[in-house]
């Protein structure tokens, strides 16, 4: 299809396949509704906004169907300034499944949630003008093979008004980041508890405005500034951490 908008207005599971040229999927449901979008071999390009625009819901799940390849891209200019990413959500967003997903964020971010962003599966490749993955309230990565190329931060959480939010937590999975600013940036707390992480960053590889912890996993970093920067406290309890180059 060309120039089409697919709007989801009720809770449920929706299986999507095929190509959409200069169109988008919009989720506009009740704030109590949960929506699952199964990407089953999808290619969506939108020149004037997000490829997937989750405007209202309680929670949204984007599931990558097994054995499928999926591609999402946006344009370099948006018709509305409210949205800011190729996949944009005003609610909690989870990406899971075992398929693959390519995200090209040509306007600002690759994936953005105003609430909690969870990645739990899939082979995900993100390129973005600014941040790769941005969950304002939090980012949690528990599984998946994730590659990020970012013009700003690779992974970021920025909530500052709630001390229990603004954190990034990596418990498992494979994460490769090439970032022009920080590799991973958290406002309150950054914890690496597991997984395999490799970061190339022009600024700090790992950065927390407050606290950080290394509790497990294998992390290798190369950075133009600090390897793991925490303003108040850094705890090292377990795991392998290799800083190949840093300032």
What residue spans do the PLM features occupy?
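A composition-driven surface/loop motif
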Residues: 1-247
